[in-house]
Structure formats: C-alpha cells, structure tokens
Amino acid sequence: MEMPEEPANSGHSLPPVYIYSPEYVSICDSLVKVPKRASMVHSLIEAYALHKQMRIVKPKVASMEEMATFHTDAYLQHLQKVSQEGDEDHPDSIEYGLGYDCPATEGIFDYAAAIGGGTITAAQCLIDGKCKVAINWSGGWHHAKKDEASGFCYLNDAVLGILRLRRKFDRILYVDLDLHHGDGVEDAFSFTSKVMTVSLHKFSPGFFPGTGDMSDVGLGKGRYYSVNVPIQDGIQDEKYYHICESVLKEVYQAFNPKAVVLQLGADTIAGDPMCSFNMTPVGIGKCLKYVLQWQLATLILGGGGYNLANTARCWTYLTGVILGKTLSSEIPDHEFFTAYGPDYVLEITPSCRPDRNEPHRIQQILNYIKGNLKHVV
C-alpha cells in the first residue's frame, strides 16, 4: 500500500481514541444490512495490531435525552416501542420511515442508542482533550431525519456528534465521502452558519436519496454553508482526490473550522455492490491525510460499505493512515481470513469501468463552489 510519509497525527503525541468494546461490536453486528461487518473491521484492525497504538475507549449508550438533542420524542418513543415488541407492521411506522429499507426489527432501538453513544463518546473525548483524532467506524449513519428513519439509518449519530462538539467548538466542518449524499446531516444544519456540510457523492436520476445537486447550498443564515459535489459513475482515485482537495482547500480558507467530522463510507470502493464509483482506499486515504494536516480535533466515522471484506480493508488501511503506519500487503491470519480470498491481500484493484466524469463538467462544478464560498464570511 502507499506509504503515509509521516504519522498523519504528527505534531501531537496523543494516540487516537478508538471506540470499541466486545458488547458494542456485537450489537453493531446485528444490523441486517451489514451483518457481522463491525466484527470483520475490528478483527482486521486487531490482526494488524493497530489497536495497540490507539487508546481504546468503551462507548457509553446514548440516553433518551442525548438522542433527543436532535430526534423528536415521538419518533424515539415509537422506535423504542416497536423495538421492544419486534412489531414490523405497526400502523404508525410508515410515517416514521420504518419499513422497507429500515425494518422495525426487535432490538433496533438498542442498536441505535449504542451507535449514537459511540459517536457521542468519541466527540466527548475530543472535547476533553484526550486525543486529536477519535474513531468510531460503526458510526456515520447520515440519512436519518429528526423524526424519520431513512436509508438503513435509524439514528443520525453524525448529527449527535456535531451537536456534542458544538459545546466546545464554535465552527464545525462536516465532510462526507460516502457514495450517497449526506442529506440527513445537511438538513439538520441547513439554516446555521456554525456548521458547514460538504458532501461528495453520486448524483444521478433515481439514485438514493436524490438530493445534493450543486445548487443545494443551504437556507436562511445557512445559505452557502452547504457544499454539494455531484459526481458520476466510474470515478477513480486521482480525479476524486483532485476534486476533494480543491473543494476542501477553498472551504478551509472560507470557513476556518475549529473541528472536523469526517464520514468515510466505503461504498465508493471498487467491488461494492452499489457498483458506482471505482475508488480504492489509497484515494480516500489521501483525502483523509489532507484533512488531518489541519491538525484540528477530528471525529472519524464509517458509513456505507456493503462489500464487507473491502470495507474492512478500507477502514483498516485508513486506521493505518491515521497512525502513519505502512501495512503489510498480506492479510494476517485471523478469524475472518477466508473472507479475503482468492488473493488475501489488503490492496483493492479498480475495475475496468469507464469514468463518466467529464473534466470540463468537474471544472464547472469546482468554479461554481468557489464562487459560492466567496459569500461565506
């Protein structure tokens, strides 16, 4: 794998905080869409002995009060009710977005409270100065609305993390590199100039969630504080990094953030069943390094990623980037070793799909964003 030139957290000696406990991983494993993914990610990080270089922090479970800093009481109470009863056919569930892609399975409330608690715990570690980087790979569920589940997301832990960070940090930058538009986070902060949201995502007719065109820039006091970068299928590392760096350079200068929340969904990676972007962890790693060189308090979250082995490869590689470690190409023997066949290596090779992103169109988008950011004061 490409070598991080120096520890990405150089300049401060505090090790990153890594949110983990066996109980936490076990409950995160229960999400129907990504079964056992949390275990696969943690096991690979452990197989490379990266956990030994981080401060492992056991997450608290989010209280009803903490979750209600964003979500409505009515939604949380309904989620708790159907979770206890395992009632998938409750008549009120549809209005709360429960069903189809967010089934109201038994125990789903406990899952949501665990994830929310993981991200809040990570944010609190940053507030308390225990670290400069805090990692919750099981977080990053960016589609949930205040009163509605959406897109496999029952609780918007990213919003809860940002709200917690706002207790200390005046201006927070949210950067979303998932394949899908970070609509729930953008909506939550669309009227404020204290949180800037930046999302690079696939934007195409019929592709979920259907929002996030470049003309979506925020509302009221928050106008120009939402930045959307619509991207087409087939994009690879070099072009993606060029876009990401160009946008973040302008955003940083205009907004001057005091803390960063970075959502690193791995559904952009070649081999994902979404079959859209054609990225590798190296490209995402370069974007991550670009953010880390600001040396701000940084909260790292996961997100999508439906090829489970590739998601574990990606987030393990990115953990190595944060630590400034080069990882051996050969996957070490561990519990899930057989999932990494037939080659058993950490690298992911892009597929042969065409890149649908025309250079002139990309330049148009970048110019448009640069123009909008002139309004940010």
UniProtKB/Swiss-Prot annotation:
Binds 1 divalent metal cation per subunit. GO terms for molecular function: DNA-binding transcription factor binding; histone deacetylase activity; histone deacetylase activity, hydrolytic mechanism; histone decrotonylase activity; Hsp70 protein binding; Hsp90 protein binding; metal ion binding. Its activity is inhibited by trichostatin A (TSA) and butyrate, 2 well known histone deacetylase inhibitors. histone deacetylase inhibitor. It catalyses: N(6)-acetyl-L-lysyl-[histone] + H2O = L-lysyl-[histone] + acetate; N(6)-acetyl-L-lysyl-[protein] + H2O = L-lysyl-[protein] + acetate; N(6)-(2E)-butenoyl-L-lysyl-[protein] + H2O = (2E)-2-butenoate + L-lysyl-[protein]. A divalent metal cation binds at D178, H180, D267. Phosphorylated by PKA on serine 39. Phosphorylation reduces deacetylase activity observed preferentially on histones H3 and H4. SUPFAM superfamilies: Arginase/deacetylase. Residues 14-324 are annotated as: Histone deacetylase. GO terms for biological process: chromatin organization; mitotic sister chromatid cohesion; negative regulation of protein ubiquitination; regulation of protein stability; regulation of telomere maintenance. It is found in: Nucleus; Chromosome; Cytoplasm. GO terms for cellular component: chromosome; cytoplasm; histone deacetylase complex; nucleus. Keywords: Chromatin regulator, Chromosome, Cytoplasm, Hydrolase, Metal-binding, Nucleus, Phosphoprotein, Repressor, Transcription, Transcription regulation. Its main location: nucleus. Pfam families: Hist_deacetyl. Its EC number is 3.5.1.98, 3.5.1.-. The active site is at H143. Substrate binds at D101, G151, Y306. The modification Phosphoserine is found at S39. Interacts with CBFA2T3. Interacts with phosphorylated SMG5/EST1B; this interaction protects SMG5 from ubiquitin-mediated degradation. Associates with alpha-SMA (smooth muscle alpha-actin). Histone deacetylase that catalyzes the deacetylation of lysine residues on the N-terminal part of the core histones (H2A, H2B, H3 and H4). Histone deacetylation gives a tag for epigenetic repression and plays an important role in transcriptional regulation, cell cycle progression and developmental events. Histone deacetylases act via the formation of large multiprotein complexes. Also involved in the deacetylation of cohesin complex protein SMC3 regulating release of cohesin complexes from chromatin. May play a role in smooth muscle cell contractility. Belongs to the histone deacetylase family. HD type 1 subfamily. This is Histone deacetylase 8. It comes from Mus musculus.
